[in-house]
Regions:
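Gly/Ser-rich catalytic serine loop of serine hydrolases
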Residues: 52-57
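Conserved active-site-proximal phosphate/metal-binding subdomains
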Residues: 7-31, 35-46, 58-285
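Non-cysteine beta-strand/loop elements that form the S-adenosyl-L-methionine
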Residues: 1-7
Length: 285
């Protein structure tokens, strides 16, 4: 089969391109119909398309099953099996899934892969958003409006920023975000001293789990580097995924989830905190 992963509704990394608006989801059917036409033209008429992302009730997709414009078609469930007795995620994680509200799933671009991913909007993601919000442009030699001196780092390295950005930086420092970390985009973000140490340790502990990592600048090439400065606006994905699956507090880690995860709360199947077995879930579907 050929999997069509809805780039707005699927959980985790979902293939949203830079030409698509993360805030304007599109109907998957025209895209799947276009894919089916291409496959049929290539003689793949009998190969099913697997619809992934946004699938909750099979009744919502009944009109697809016999539709020649998309059929043969199958459906993939990624989020619902998380909330089963056999699922290896922690009890806290399962409990949290039962409380999510619509809008709690956040399509974000903090991933070290450089791609969008869909995850629960928890303190982990809010902290990442805060890093990017506390960000200003700088140059190393004064030019134009960027001529106001500001010092960052333990050695007080001099950079030049605009007057308004200098005022922002001074405000953030007064709030406890004392450490300025440079990004590969000629900007600097402000974080606490504790967070700065954590970021730098995670970067130095990189185990090369990605072929290219924006966070650590590791790359699977002869130079072992992307050639860009490590990006402190991101995070170590291997560390956070290992930590959450091994029982760390879910608010402190990345919680991948599909857009429909908020439906756990109001679906009568999960009333009173009911967690089904895989068999019970399949029977329900």
């Amino acid at each position: 089969g050929v999997v069509y992963e809805d780039p707005w509704r699927a959980g985790g990394h979902n293939g949203l391109s830079n030409s698509e608006d993360p805030n304007v989801p599109e109907d998957p059917r025209p895209r799947v119909a276009e894919l089916r036409k291409v496959m049929n033209d290539l003689g793949l008429n009998s190969v099913p398309i697997v619809m992934a992302g946004g699938v909750w009730y099979m009744r919502d997709w009944a009109d697809w099953i016999e539709d020649p414009d998309v059929a043969p078609v199958a459906f993939q469930f990624g989020t619902r099996p998380l909330l089963t007795q056999e699922s290896p995620i922690s009890k806290e994680w399962k409990t949290r899934l039962l409380t999510l509200e619509e809008g709690d799933i956040f399509l974000n671009k903090f991933s070290p892969t450089g791609f969008y991913s869909s995850a629960v909007r928890n303190p982990f993601l809010r902290e990442l958003k805060g890093r990017s919000d506390r960000q200003i442009a700088f140059v190393e030699e004064a030019e134009g409006d960027l001529h106001h001196e500001f010092k960052i780092g333990a050695r007080g390295r001099q950079i030049f920023v605009t007057a308004s950005d200098k005022a922002l930086a001074e405000k953030w420092v007064s709030e406890g975000y004392t450490d300025g970390l440079r990004t590969p985009d000629s900007t600097v973000i402000f974080v606490s001293a504790e967070k700065s140490k954590e970021i730098q340790k995670d970067q130095s502990d990189c185990m090369g789990c990605l072929s290219q990592c924006q966070f650590s600048n590791w790359a699977q090439n002869e130079a072992a580097t992307t050639g860009r400065r490590p990006d402190p606006r991101s995070y170590c994905i291997q560390k956070t995924l290992q930590d959450i699956v091994h029982g760390d507090p879910v608010d402190d880690q990345l919680m991948f989830a599909g857009h429909n995860a908020f439906k756990f709360k109001d679906d009568p199947f999960y009333s009173n905190g009911f967690i089904p077995t895989v068999k019970e879930l399949i029977d329900r579907l």
